[in-house]
A protein has these predicted regions:
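Outer-membrane beta-barrel proteins
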Residues: 2-213
């Protein structure tokens, strides 16, 4: 679900040179390499490395649009995932914010890859490091997800994120724990351990390096 105007697309392409700002909006880009693409407790690429990256446009009013991609391996035709998303974030009170939006998860790689396409709507609430999100499956995909995460710093450079959730009829209950920090030169690292009731033969581990542009 992507409704970016031509002028915004042109600005987005320039973002590969670094984060830039317009009069009322900011465009940024990111790229990452991970040893294992994990989504809601389940590996999305058969525990193999994945190259990932995306672009984001955010207006000062709170509206945002973005696209993010990754290599995937589900054992079928799918080889590439592209997520198109948009939404609106706003403050409810000092330190208390909300986020509403839509995401299209689109898959490429073969004749039947598009059969895995999924659309979701989401509603999120954030306060004091806690994020509570509800994801509503749309179209033929009606599995809903509720997720709670908490992020905090243990030093000035090192952060921790703890997540629990329930992905109805897919991974069911899942959890993850991640620690992240800077490597230098604008490059960050992240180590995540995750598991789920369904969809994995073992606990998943991922080490990632990323850079925002």
């Amino acid at each position: 679900m992507k409704t970016i105007k031509t002028t915004v697309v042109a600005v987005t392409l320039l973002a590969s040179l670094g984060g830039i700002q317009t009069a009322s909006a900011e465009v940024s880009a990111n790229v990452a390499l991970t040893s294992n693409y994990i989504f809601r407790g389940v590996t999305q690429n058969n525990e193999d490395p994945a190259l990932q990256g995306g672009f984001d446009w955010e207006d000062k009013s709170g509206f945002y649009l973005g696209v993010w991609g990754s290599s995937v391996d589900f054992g079928g035709d799918e080889s590439t995932e592209l997520d198109f998303y948009g939404g609106y974030g706003f403050d409810l009170a000092p330190g208390f914010s909300a986020d509403i939006g839509l995401t299209l998860f689109k898959f490429f790689g073969g004749d039947s890859a598009s059969d895995s396409d999924v659309e979701e709507a989401h509603l999120g609430l954030s306060y004091a490091g806690f994020d509570l999100y509800y994801y509503l499956g749309l179209s033929d995909f009606d599995s809903d997800t509720i997720e709670l995460s908490y992020g905090f710093d243990i030093t000035s450079d090192i952060g921790v994120t703890l997540t629990v959730g329930d992905f109805e009829d897919v991974s069911d209950f899942y959890y993850s724990a991640g620690v992240s920090g800077p490597l230098g030169y604008g490059v960050d690292w992240d180590l995540t351990v995750a598991d789920a009731d369904e969809g994995n033969d073992s606990t998943q581990v991922a080490f990632s390096i990323s850079k925002s542009l």
